[in-house]
């Protein structure tokens, strides 16, 4: 069990995302980069989950019977497609405003998703366990990475998976993901990312090891401005994803 007296919530981060919550489902709004990134991360998640659990990726609902947790779910950009693929989905976010937006959009889409305004630590303390934990674009916004990764890892069932997507702590990432995306191109509101809170792949791997999870895959994700699309890459200097499993 994690210790409830401690939390990884950064109040300023929650306030920041709550202010722009109404724009979660606007593909041309503040979350445009996530809308563009979504197809790449969705394809990766579906591919790896189907391979792990011996599911037919071409089936209409290949994730049927699997329990998913989307940590820091925001407006539900990942929860909804996972639910459409048959997964039982819990979406958790510390921002009650984000959760309200997510609930409204799910209802409009006739999707049954269990959205909760809660913290990762509270879920872990309650003994929640999942086949798949999605930890996507969240770890760079928490106040205590080690505690956060400990709590999230505790919720992965034996034989289960955890996906993490984040931004590397490199000068290249500072130039592209912060200066470029926030100040020059203004794709994201200024202050969305803070360089000192970015996380290196080896730091995540160390956190996995402490939690008895085994790293099984890692890859970079790069943006092609000519095609206006994101693609898998060997270059992990800026955006990257890692996948870990808990041995059965």
From Swiss-Prot:
Its EC number is 2.1.1.222, 2.1.1.64. It catalyses: a 3-demethylubiquinol + S-adenosyl-L-methionine = a ubiquinol + S-adenosyl-L-homocysteine + H(+); a 3-(all-trans-polyprenyl)benzene-1,2-diol + S-adenosyl-L-methionine = a 2-methoxy-6-(all-trans-polyprenyl)phenol + S-adenosyl-L-homocysteine + H(+). S-adenosyl-L-methionine binds at residues 41, 72, 93, 136. GO terms for molecular function: 2-polyprenyl-6-hydroxyphenol methylase activity; 3-demethylubiquinol 3-O-methyltransferase activity; polyprenyldihydroxybenzoate methyltransferase activity. Gene3D superfamilies: Vaccinia Virus protein VP39 (3.40.50.150). Pfam families: Methyltransf_23. O-methyltransferase that catalyzes the 2 O-methylation steps in the ubiquinone biosynthetic pathway. Belongs to the methyltransferase superfamily. UbiG/COQ3 family. Keywords: Methyltransferase, S-adenosyl-L-methionine, Transferase, Ubiquinone biosynthesis. This is Ubiquinone biosynthesis O-methyltransferase. It comes from the Bacteria. Pathway: Cofactor biosynthesis; ubiquinone biosynthesis. GO terms for biological process: methylation. It is an enzyme of class 2 (transferase).
């Amino acid at each position: 069990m994690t210790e409830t007296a401690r939390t990884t919530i950064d109040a300023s981060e929650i306030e920041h995302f709550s202010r722009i919550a109404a724009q979660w489902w606007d593909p041309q709004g503040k979350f445009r980069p996530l809308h563009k990134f979504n197809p790449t991360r969705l394809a990766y998640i579906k591919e790896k989950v189907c391979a792990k659990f011996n599911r037919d990726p071409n089936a209409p609902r290949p994730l049927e019977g699997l329990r998913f947790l989307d940590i820091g779910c925001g407006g539900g950009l990942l929860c909804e497609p996972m639910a459409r693929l048959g997964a039982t989905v819990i979406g958790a976010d510390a921002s009650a405003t984000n959760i309200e937006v997510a609930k409204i959009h799910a209802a409009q889409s006739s999707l049954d998703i269990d959205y909760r305004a809660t913290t990762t630590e509270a879920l872990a303390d309650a003994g929640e366990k999942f086949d798949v934990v999605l930890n996507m674009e969240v770890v760079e916004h928490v106040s205590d990475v080690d505690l956060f990764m400990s709590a999230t890892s505790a919720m992965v069932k034996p034989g289960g998976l955890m996906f993490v997507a984040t931004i590397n702590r490199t000068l290249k990432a500072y130039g592209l993901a912060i200066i470029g995306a926030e100040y020059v191109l203004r794709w994201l509101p200024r202050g969305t990312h803070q360089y000192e809170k970015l996380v290196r792949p080896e730091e995540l791997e160390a956190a996995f090891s402490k939690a008895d999870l085994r790293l099984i895959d890692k890859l970079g994700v790069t943006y092609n401005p000519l095609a206006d699309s994101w693609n898998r890459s060997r270059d992990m200097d800026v955006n990257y994803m890692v996948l870990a499993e808990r041995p059965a």
